[in-house]
Amino acid sequence: MQLSVWTYEGPPHIGAMRIATAMRDVHYVLHAPQGDTYADLLFTMIERRDRRPPVTYTTFQARDLGGDTADLLQSAVRAAYERFQPQAMLVGASCTAELIQDDPGGLAQALKLPIPVIPLELPAYQRKENWGASETFYRIVRALAASSADGSPRREREAGARPVCNLLGPTALGFRHRDDLAEVTRQVVELGIEINVVAPWNATPADLARLPQAGFNIVLYPEIALTAAQWLHRQFGQPFTRTIPIGVGATRDFIAEVAALAGVDASPVLARSESRLPWYSRSVDSTYLTGKRVFIFGDATHAVAAARVATQELGFEVVGLGTYAREFAREIREAAAVYGVEPLITDDYLEVEARVGELRPELVLGTQMERHIAKRLGIPCAVISAPCHVQDFPARYSPQMGFEGANVLFDTWVHPLMMGLEEHLLGMFREDHEFADHAPSHLGAASAAPAPAPLRVVETVTSTELAWASDAERELTKIPFFVRGKARRNTERFARERNVNLITLETLYDAKAHFGR
């Protein structure tokens, strides 16, 4: 067992909750002990939903283990049906309840309720949240779509009829899923394509039964919808998209792919495409962009897309690329090979922190944890992927996909670099009389502060007793903070190799010239 203060993904039943919460007229009965009800807070506190997830917990306690927990589960299922009257019910166990092996799905089906009861077998000790969401969505689609069709191939569209598609993948607690869906919907409608079903977002079981009526499927998040889309392709002959529209180039490719599947002309939509990212990235001071070293980590979909945007549209250099989702390790390895970097496939945040510390990039694109890591290391950062915190569920419209999403990416990624330069300039000129350590105030003048202590030599003692002269230390502070650590390490390495115990201003300049060759 590995103890940790952070995990990139929760257990698979959290993924099942994301699907149930995203849908309507679905209820999830979770066989779980009293302490597993914490998951509600993910949706009400972090995502700021206005209602609790549609989940009933059996909440058995330690004393119940000596009795019949199976009867407790059946009572909870029966009560949930009578109270909420859902169109379909999901039944599963939490990671803790899995240990007592009560077979929740079988027990619920034995009640013979007049609605579909979909059992979920989610191995909590082998799989995690995204897999749980994918498996849950697949099970629901398979149970409801198969019951409404005979499995025959889809019918060809009649002449003159509008093409029809499904949008698959948006869930509760997803990174900008709400706004991505709005942006992609607008683009699909502009192509003259009718949207049959959006799932699981706001879909009902009756909606899922209509999935086979579409001509093709648009997969927005492969971590969630790829398995279901593959089954729909095998069962009903529905092709599905593979391009994720994040960034200007990928959005244009996505529109072309959707148009090809629908048999429509994409050129009018592509001609009207408006995004400020291409011009902004060409017009902005190259100091902010060109050649900036960036480290990328997140779910595979957003990480691979971010690498393409960073290199092809912003002129960054990718120095690290990784994911916590082992199910999509192949995609990350293929992308890492393109950029000539070593892929990082891990769900241990300490490994990620070590890699960031080793590479010392100028920008980190990652999850909420990479935000903390970058802050500790003094590196600019932007969040591009779940897991994320409350500030990444904004009230404003802020997609990641489509042409408007490209504008959001530019602002989100470039502004930390610009602010970093601003902080550096403030640091350089902080001794100027026009700058002060404290923010200006409209209040009356404070009492005179004591005179500052005289400057003294700051000694940084290392294993080889290195010390920094005060003038060298002051000069070091003029180096931008995001490369200051690297400059310090290189200078100390230069001094050790030459048996220099006191690093002076001359030593600092010599080291800079040595490593700048």
Curated annotation (Swiss-Prot):
Enzyme class, spelled out: oxidoreductase
GO BP term, pick one: light-independent bacteriochlorophyll biosynthetic process
Catalytic site: 285
Quaternary assembly: Protochlorophyllide reductase is composed of three subunits; BchL, BchN and BchB. Forms a heterotetramer of two BchB and two BchN subunits.
Required cofactor(s): [4Fe-4S] cluster
Protein name: Light-independent protochlorophyllide reductase subunit B
Pathway info: Porphyrin-containing compound metabolism; bacteriochlorophyll biosynthesis (light-independent)
HAMAP family: ChlB_BchB (MF_00353)
EC nos: 1.3.7.7
Taxonomic path: Bacteria, Pseudomonadati, Pseudomonadota, Alphaproteobacteria, Hyphomicrobiales
Any GO MF annotation of the entry: oxidoreductase activity, acting on iron-sulfur proteins as donors
